[in-house]
């Protein structure tokens, strides 16, 4: 009889795949999430960029990955640690991306906090160096105007 992998093991496997495919295939993340899943980001304000707003449900999460793929090319995405306590899994790592239009490189530590209910992820909150993102995307003036 096989044992069901822990939420931490499932999250780690999804990120390992994400790194190996260099961000071209987000499907393992969809195996984790429920229909009521919400993805949120520390990036603010929400109208700054598609990646900044909350993404609720599979279709909106697909929009997130499409926006990421449209603008950024993954250089690396390394897992440092995955911690599980109760229904919470925290992924800690680093990533480096090149903006497809500006050519700028953004390297940042990254922390993703996952919340699970009944074996399905219901929420993920991502934290990263937002200034590196804004600089890399050439959006400093837009951010200054929004602030």
PLM regions: where:
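Short, low-complexity N-terminal intrinsically disordered segments enriched in polar/charged residues
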Residues: 1-35, 142-147
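A beta-strand edge to alpha-helix "cap/lid" segment located at domain peripheries
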Residues: 2-6, 66-147
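Hydrophobic pocket/interface hotspot
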Residues: 11, 29, 33, 37, ...
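Generic anion/oxyanion-binding catalytic loop in active/binding sites
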Residues: 18, 50, 103
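Generic recognition of cysteine residues
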Residues: 21, 53-56, 95
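Short, solvent-exposed loop/turn segments that connect beta-strands within catalytic domains
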Residues: 23, 47, 101-103
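A solvent-exposed, acidic/Ser-Thr-rich amphipathic alpha-helical stretch
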Residues: 32-87
């Amino acid at each position: 009889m096989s044992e069901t992998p822990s939420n931490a093991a499932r999250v780690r496997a999804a990120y390992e795949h994400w790194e190996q495919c260099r961000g071209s295939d987000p499907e393992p993340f969809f195996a984790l999430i429920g229909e009521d899943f919400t993805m949120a980001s520390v990036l603010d304000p929400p109208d700054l960029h598609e990646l900044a707003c909350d993404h609720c449900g599979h279709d909106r999460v697909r929009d997130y990955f499409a926006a990421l793929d449209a603008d950024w090319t993954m250089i690396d995405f390394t897992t440092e640690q995955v911690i599980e306590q109760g229904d919470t899994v925290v992924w800690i790592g680093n990533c480096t991306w090149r903006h497809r239009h500006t050519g700028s490189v953004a390297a940042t530590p990254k922390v993703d906090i996952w919340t699970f209910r009944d074996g399905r992820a219901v929420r993920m909150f991502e934290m990263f160096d937002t200034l590196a993102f804004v600089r890399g995307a050439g959006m400093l003036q837009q951010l200054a105007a929004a602030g």
